[in-house]
Amino acid sequence: AANLGLCLATLSLLFLVTSCRKQAAASSDDSPARPAGDVIAEADTLYASRGDLTRVRQGLIALRHSQATEAGSYDLAWRLAKFNYYLGSHSPDDTERDKAFSDGIEAGKLAVKLQDGKPEGHFWLGANYGGSAKVSMLSGLSEITEIKREMETVLKLDEGYSAGSAYM
């Protein structure tokens, strides 16, 4: 009888722990996504402190998380390209740098696909092509045409965008 009582107590405890874990997991999965505007404001604040690459990485995480629920957001896409460009340009880690430029190119392509008539996507796509070209001679030769095309598009759309830095 003592063994039966111990078994029942153990099973009850196991059931209680398991149901608490399931409830905690369900409540964390049900949390509503933050509005993209809030995430963008947070990311812009983090970018203002970009001298600390940890802030850039935090911004990238927030933007990626938001993009998972708002894949069609132009403002998220071009900012992802911008943050990736900065990380790629300043990271001392070659692997992180290469991934940042690659991710930045993909984000820039998405931004251009979403809003072809706006300069930000073209600018940051071209910047990431340029960053990638700078670190890889093979990539650089193949991306010259893309860099030129994107920067010419920026100049056509808004000659003064980013203080005219599209004039290379």
Q: Model segments located where?
A:
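Short, flexible active-site loop motifs that bind/organize anionic cofactors or intermediates
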Residues: 10, 66, 71
